[in-house]
C-alpha cells in the first residue's frame, strides 16, 4: 500500500526582509536573493569549486542589493538528498550566516523542489542522479501538496508507481541518464529561485541554525575503491 505523507506546515517570516536561498545539491552553484519583491539569481555549473565560489557570489548579491547578512529575514537551503559534499557546503555556509543574527532557516527537500516544476497533478515522479548507478526519487501529488512515497535511492529501472496511481509525468536529471526511470519525464532541475518560492508557500518548517538538518537516504555515504570496482564489475 502506498504511503501518504503530508508536507509540513509552517508560516514563513512575513516581515518582508530579504531572503537568501542556497542550492548546492548538484555540481551547480545556485544562489537566489529575494529583496523588495525582486529575485536576483546566480546559477552556474561550477563543478568542484562550490566551496571557493559560494561566499564570493553571496557577497556579490548582497552588495548589489545594498544589504548584509544581518538584514536577512530567512535563509533557505537545499536539504537533500543530493551530492553529500555539496549539501554540507551549502548547509554550513547557511548556518554560518544565520547563527550570529539568529536568522531562521528553512530546509527544502531537493525532490520536492524538482516536483514543484511540474503542473499540478495527482501523481508525478521526481528523480535525480544519485551516482553509482542509482537515483534518488519520490512520488508526489502536486495538486494537494502531498508526498505519496518515502524518499528513496535505488536503480531507476526498479521504480514502480504507487499502488492505484497513474503517473502523469516525471522531472529531474535522472531522466537524462542512460539508465533512466521507466516513465515519461523531463530532465529539468530547480534553481535556488524555485526553493525561495516553495519556502514562501509556508509548507516547510523554519528552525534555528543549530537544529538545521540535512536529508540523507543512503545508509552509507561513501564506498571504498574496492566496493566501487565491485559494483562496476556487476552485469
Regions of interest found by a model, annotated:
Residues 41-46, 79-83, 183-186:
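A short glycine/serine-rich beta->alpha loop
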Residues 58-73, 162-167:
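Phosphate/pyrophosphate-binding loops at sites that engage ATP/ADP/AMP, CoA/4′-phosphopantetheine
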Residues 43-65:
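N-terminal phosphate-binding loop and adjacent alpha-helix
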Residues 2-38, 49-52, 106-235:
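Oxyanion-binding and handling regions
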Residues 35, 56-58, 79:
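Short, conserved active-site loops that position catalytic residues or coordinate cofactors/metal ions
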Residues 74-105:
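DPxDG-like acidic metal-binding loop motif
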Residues 58, 94, 111:
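Generic structural marker for isolated residues within well-ordered, non-membrane alpha-helices
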Amino acid at each position: 500500500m502506498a504511503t501518504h505523507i503530508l508536507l509540513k506546515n509552517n508560516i514563513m517570516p512575513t516581515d518582508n526582509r530579504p531572503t537568501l536561498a542556497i542550492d548546492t545539491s548538484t555540481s551547480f552553484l545556485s544562489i537566489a536573493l529575494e529583496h523588495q519583491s525582486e529575485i536576483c539569481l546566480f546559477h552556474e555549473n561550477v563543478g568542484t569549486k562550490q566551496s571557493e565560489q559560494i561566499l564570493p557570489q553571496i557577497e556579490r548579491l548582497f552588495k548589489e542589493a545594498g544589504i548584509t547578512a544581518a538584514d536577512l529575514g530567512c535563509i533557505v537551503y537545499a536539504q537533500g538528498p543530493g551530492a553529500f559534499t555539496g549539501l554540507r557546503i551549502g548547509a554550513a555556509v547557511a548556518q554560518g550566516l544565520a547563527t550570529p543574527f539568529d536568522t531562521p532557516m528553512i530546509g527544502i527537500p531537493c525532490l520536492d523542489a524538482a516536483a514543484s516544476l511540474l503542473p499540478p497533478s495527482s501523481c508525478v515522479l521526481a528523480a535525480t542522479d544519485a551516482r553509482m548507478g542509482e537515483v534518488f526519487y519520490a512520488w508526489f501529488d502536486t495538486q494537494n501538496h502531498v508526498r505519496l512515497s518515502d524518499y528513496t535511492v535505488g536503480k531507476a529501472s526498479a521504480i514502480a508507481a504507487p499502488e492505484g496511481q497513474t503517473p502523469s509525468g516525471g522531472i529531474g536529471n535522472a531522466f537524462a541518464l542512460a539508465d533512466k526511470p521507466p516513465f515519461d519525464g523531463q530532465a529539468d532541475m530547480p534553481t535556488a529561485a524555485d526553493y525561495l518560492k516553495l519556502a514562501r508557500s509556508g509548507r516547510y518548517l523554519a528552525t534555528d541554525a543549530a537544529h538545521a538538518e540535512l536529508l540523507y537516504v543512503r545508509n552509507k555515504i561513501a564506498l571504498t575503491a574496492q566496493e566501487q570496482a565491485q559494483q562496476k564489475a556487476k552485469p
